[in-house]
Regions:
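Glycoside hydrolase catalytic-domain context in secreted enzymes
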Residues: 1-183
């Protein structure tokens, strides 16, 4: 049975700091894993670092729960593909699925098990800065491509070693920004 501290720790998902400027206290992150104060990371890059953190989570904690390691794998990981808005112009769901599959293989090889993609906001104001992450203003096209992204990232049953979890984002009506404001 999990303690309250362990349950709260599982809800904590800090940035690992690899994709930010400035100093990152790796010793503090390691201590947080050992003390079961986190359930995962995002923005951690590098298989060695991720494997070391996973080993601590599994071997040095009471419950041995693996960490969720997430990243914004929006249009590729090591191989960079066109942005989602550009991909949507093709109406080619198979190409989108292949892109997501390649991205999943590359990200999972680096220890990533979760992506914050696809973005399914229906965007109607081209001034909004996040419009490039989505499929534009057509709900039908957006639904077809979202399905293709998820199939590509997750495969058929999430049993393969090269599959990653897909987290469809954002919130209802987040894409209905006014005057291009990101609120």
């Amino acid at each position: 049975k999990m303690t309250l501290h362990e349950k709260l720790g599982q809800l904590n998902l800090p940035s690992g700091g690899d994709l930010v400027t400035g100093n990152v206290n790796s010793a503090e992150l390691t201590k947080m894993v050992r003390d079961q104060e986190i359930g995962g990371f995002f923005n951690v890059k590098g298989i060695r670092k991720i494997v070391d953190l996973q080993r601590i989570a599994i071997d040095s904690t009471r419950l041995g729960i693996p960490l969720l390691v997430g990243a914004d794998v929006i249009h590729g990981y090591e191989t960079i593909f066109p942005i989602p808005l550009a991909l949507s112009c093709s109406w080619d769901t198979l190409a989108v699925e292949r892109m997501a599959r390649i991205s999943a293989v590359e990200a999972s090889a680096d220890g990533i098990c979760w992506t914050f993609s696809p973005m399914v906001d229906i965007c109607r104001d081209s001034r909004w800065g996040r419009i490039a992450e989505g499929s534009g203003e057509d709900p039908y096209l957006g639904s077809l491509l979202a399905k293709a992204y998820v199939r590509g990232y997750q495969g058929n049953n999430m049993q393969g070693k090269n599959e990653i979890l897909s987290c469809v984002k954002h919130f209802a009506l987040y894409g209905a920004s006014e005057s291009g404001k990101d609120y």
